[in-house]
Design a protein with these regions (language model features):
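Hydrophobic faces of well-ordered beta-strands that scaffold small-molecule active sites
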Residues: 339-341, 373-375, 397-399, 530-532, ...
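Aromatic-lined substrate-binding rim segments of carbohydrate-active enzymes
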Residues: 368, 372-416, 500-517
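Active-site neighborhood of glycoside hydrolase catalytic domains
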Residues: 392, 409-496, 640
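Loop/turn elements at helix/coil->beta-strand transitions in domains of secreted/extracellular proteins
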Residues: 336, 366-373, 391-398, 431-437, ...
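Substrate-binding clefts and catalytic carboxylate motifs of secreted carbohydrate-active enzymes
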Residues: 14-15, 174-177, 438, 475-478, ...
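The substrate-binding groove and active-site-proximal loops of carbohydrate-active enzymes
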Residues: 103, 168-171, 278-279, 342-355, ...
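Secreted/periplasmic carbohydrate-active enzymes, especially glycoside hydrolases
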Residues: 1-372, 612-613, 617, 642, ...
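Alpha-helical scaffolding within the catalytic cores
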Residues: 321-327, 383-385, 420-428
Length: 839
């Protein structure tokens, strides 16, 4: 097979008009215009309003390429477009070769008849989706009125990432373009059409069944060879006879063959003493390479497809128990407590989503002790690279299909389109070790059940929902992947409008803290089986705000700051919660900092509670991990990759072992959650300290917490400190057998009432090979101490930490964690460093 890449330099123009500029493909209208200096940064100030209007026009991308004579001799020449956004007409040498209408699909067109020897032209016209929506004609009684928060009317009529039309955390950047690879494939031989890999686990062995479908002429003369390797060394292979589908599996050192005349060809290989794949925190992530080769009658390799798999069983357990039915990921027979967050598209301009960006975000998840990420259904299906990284890092993927918070008009054309979309993406992703479940949609069953603005829609649209998500979608998923657990919606109790928000079954989304302005303590009233969404907003750091504002804009109620806040009344909510917990900050920068502390406290409150009730609750996925532009939002990592306080706190509250405290009347209970596969012996010390960090009371204890157990380890009556509650804080310190020390701090009154002194913090920096170590001392209790840097972006080993005694505290910065700038030496780090404190 010959491959001609068409990435690189293209020309961008308004359709039918002169050239505007060059654009690098993968690229888009916005990336091209901004890169050429034709428009300002789309994210700066209120430029969103300007860029939105650009997409009332049609645009075209064009370039030339050379097709050599030997290419034209091939029987098939296929144009492969892995990402066209969205309504596109493709022309080769002025002749229309085909059209596309779904950014979630790969489009393949046979273009041989349009090519000639020498220079050829390809032109792709992207039609305005806004004009398409305006011209859309509904059937009688099926006009859709519902619009998602922050979105645009009609967004659900197009198979385009819904959040590109705006969301309550994202702008209306309705971009268009070629956002993934585009290339030609020329060949005359049969091709591998599909590879499906399934596993059967039995006594210390795994049977790997590889099903290979082949298309083209002379298939009966071809052979298929499958080789399974780990670390580049073959561990097994298997051959079946030309007419056999099953034989006894055996281990051998070379890949062996089966006739492709059995189409599909089925090969079963057996791996004894397999190395099992585990989620992060439960074991290693060994991967096996499955290489599938198509050979002609002479043994020449015609095509090779390689997929990486992990050997594991992975499903959702829904066993009945005394509370209802559990909802827990079960990996290799072990029920795990899912800890993670919701992942949205990494950028509004999709061609800027690089493997490096994905790797950084997922590494940040792993470093914060995540074992699960939910790919949310209002965005897009990430690249193969994303799932490869999740496989490597042990991050279970809760995979939504791309339907979210919407009402759909189910026409015949729409049904055909989404069925192909689902089939293609399920086949593409089904082999990944990290794939935990398929979910039909986000919040749509719940919306039809009790959202008034959705319930008021036509009964015919409700019928469309039932047909789509009870029949069409699950049928398409199961036809392509019968192995992976399917869940109709999130939240849900299993579909069919059977009380989708039932706390005792399925998964739940909980938003009374935040949208309902309930206090953090409200989390303790709920015992969800699996909380797949809950969240709290914060502002990004000052450096991020400076990227999209002028100095005059730096007030949270300015026009620009409100433009970069897409949730109505959210800034007021932040101030409300701030007033409940903290004194009003003295300046704008401090306000941003305190908002992040609030966010971290809220999420910690919920996660600590649910981890204390492991067994009843078996998962927490907070909303949300990342941003797609610089904005005030629920994210724990901002658009530029800067960790907020929440992400540093998550590293602790999602730790394999985590200590927490909660009040029960006059008793302060200290809990230790252990999610590891080993029992944990501990020593616990409980302190009452004053603002000078002097110990007023100390209690100790020892014990062991079992495997995957959460238990109270110390109970302290604190009623005797009522008269001193404004002058003290409480600290629990747990030392594990391996020497790790875990700490938690609580107060008896909100921080706003504490008589905090202004801390004097000294900092000395030492360079130690590949790292810097920051040595800190504080003159008094300094909660939520934060270290920032003027120029470089860094990820510290710890941040937003409590300084609870006069002893030296050390914070490590690995040099590899310095980004977007440089730190030359210890003196330079000292000069760039800024320390923020609550008092």
């Amino acid at each position: 097979m010959r491959k001609i890449m068409l990435n690189g330099q293209w020309e961008l123009a308004e359709a039918g008009n002169d050239r505007l500029c060059e654009v690098q493909v993968p690229g888009s209208v916005l990336s091209g215009l901004y890169g050429a200096g034709k428009i300002e940064d789309p994210f700066y100030r209120t430029n969103e309003d300007v860029t939105r209007e650009l997409f009332r026009k049609d645009y075209e991308f064009s370039r030339t390429f050379v097709a050599a004579e030997d290419i034209l001799k091939e029987e098939k020449i296929i144009l492969v477009c892995e990402g066209l956004d969205t309504l596109a007409d493709i022309y080769i040498n002025g002749q229309k070769a085909g059209s596309a209408d779904n950014m979630h699909r790969t489009w393949k067109l046979d273009v041989k008849e349009f090519l000639h020897s020498g220079e050829n032209q390809i032109r792709i016209v992207f039609r305005s989706v806004l004009k398409y929506i305006e011209a859309y004609e509904y059937e009688d009684n099926k006009e859709i009125h519902y619009v998602p928060c922050g979105g645009m009317k009609g967004n659900q009529l197009i198979r385009k990432a819904h959040c590109m039309f705006g969301w309550d955390w994202g702008p209306q950047t309705i971009d268009a373009g070629i956002f993934r690879d585009i290339y030609l494939e020329a060949y005359s031989h049969p091709r591998i059409e599909d590879v499906k890999i399934t596993q059967v686990h039995w006594d210390n062995a795994v049977d790997v069944c590889t099903t290979v479908a082949v298309s083209g002429n002379a298939v009966d003369k071809c052979q298929v060879r499958v080789t399974i390797q780990e670390d580049a060394e073959s561990v097994c292979g298997h051959r079946t006879g030309a007419n056999d589908r099953k034989t006894e599996a055996h281990v051998c050192k070379v890949g062996e063959t089966v006739s492709a005349n059995n189409n599909p060809a089925v090969l079963t290989s057996s791996i004894h003493n397999p190395k099992l794949w585990w989620p992060n925190g439960y074991g290693d992530q060994p991967l096996y390479k499955v290489q599938v080769e198509l050979l002609d009658e002479y043994g020449t390799v015609l095509e090779t497809i390689t997929k990486r798999i992990g050997l594991r069983t992975l499903t959702i357990s829904q066993e009945k128990d005394l509370w209802g039915k559990e909802f827990a990921f079960c990996v290799n027979g072990v029920k795990i407590f899912a800890m993670g967050g919701n992942y949205i598209p990494e950028d509004c301009i999709y061609s800027r989503i690089t493997p490096e960006v994905q790797k950084y975000l997922l590494e940040s998840c792993k470093r914060a002790n995540f074992n699960c990420v939910r790919v949310w259904g209002g965005g897009y299906y990430p690249s193969d690279h994303f799932y490869d990284l999740c496989d490597e890092m042990g991050l279970i993927v809760w995979q939504d299909l791309m339907f979210a918070c919407n009402v759909y008009d189910l026409t015949e054309e729409f049904e055909e389109n989404i069925t192909k979309e689902i089939t293609e993406n399920v086949k593409r992703l089904r082999h990944h070790a990290s794939l935990g479940l398929w979910c039909g949609n986000n919040e749509m069953e719940s919306a039809w059940d009790h959202w008034p603005e959705v319930q008021s829609e036509s009964k015919y649209l409700r019928a469309d929902y039932i047909k789509m998500f009870e029949y069409i979608v699950p049928k398409a998923v199961r036809a392509a992947d019968s192995e992976t657990f399917f869940w109709q919606s999130s939240p849900s109790s299993g579909g069919c409008f059977d009380d989708p928000d039932d706390e005792n079954r399925g998964d739940c989304h909980y938003w009374d803290v935040w949208h309902g302005q309930k206090p953090f303590t409200d989390y303790q009233k709920h015992y969800f089986r699996f909380c797949s969404e809950f969240g709290f907003q914060s502002f990004p750091c000052l450096k991020t705000v400076e990227s999209f504002t002028e100095e005059k804009d730096r007030n949270i109620f300015s026009r620009v700051m409100e433009n970069h806040q897409k949730n109505p009344a959210a800034n007021g909510k932040i101030l409300y919660y701030l007033s409940e917990n903290f004194r009003y900050p003295e300046n704008f920068r401090k306000l941003l900092y305190v908002s992040q502390i609030l966010q971290g406290m809220a999420m910690k409150y919920g996660v600590d509670h649910w981890r204390r009730h492991r067994g009843r609750c078996m998962g927490t996925l907070y909303w949300q991990i990342n941003d797609n532009w610089p904005v005030a939002s629920w994210s724990s990592i901002d658009y530029f990759g800067r960790w907020k306080a929440l992400h540093y706190m998550a590293k602790k509250f999602y730790g394999p072992q985590a200590v927490s405290m909660c009040m029960d009347g006059d008793i302060m209970q200290v809990y230790l959650a252990n999610e590891s596969m080993d029992a944990q012996s501990y020593q616990v010390a409980f302190y009452v300290k004053n603002m000078e960090c002097e110990i007023l009371e100390k209690l100790t204890g020892t014990g062991t917490v079992g495997v995957q157990e959460s238990a109270p380890i110390l109970a302290v009556d604190v009623s005797g400190w009522e008269d001193k509650k404004y002058e003290i804080f409480l600290e629990a310190e747990v030392t594990l057998a391996d020497g790790d020390v875990l700490c938690d701090v609580e107060t008896l009154v909100p921080y706003k009432y504490l008589e905090l002194d202004k801390p004097e913090i000294t900092a000395e920096v030492e360079e130690q090979g590949d790292a810097f170590v920051i040595h800190l001392k504080s003159s008094c209790f300094s909660p939520f101490t934060a270290i920032g840097f003027i120029d470089a972006d860094v990820t510290l080993e710890d941040n937003f930490f409590h300084m609870t005694d006069g002893e030296e505290m050390c914070v490590r910065l690995d040099k590899k964690d310095i980004r977007n700038g440089e730190i030359l030496d210890a003196a330079d780090l000292t000069q760039q460093m800024e320390i923020l404190t609550l008092a």
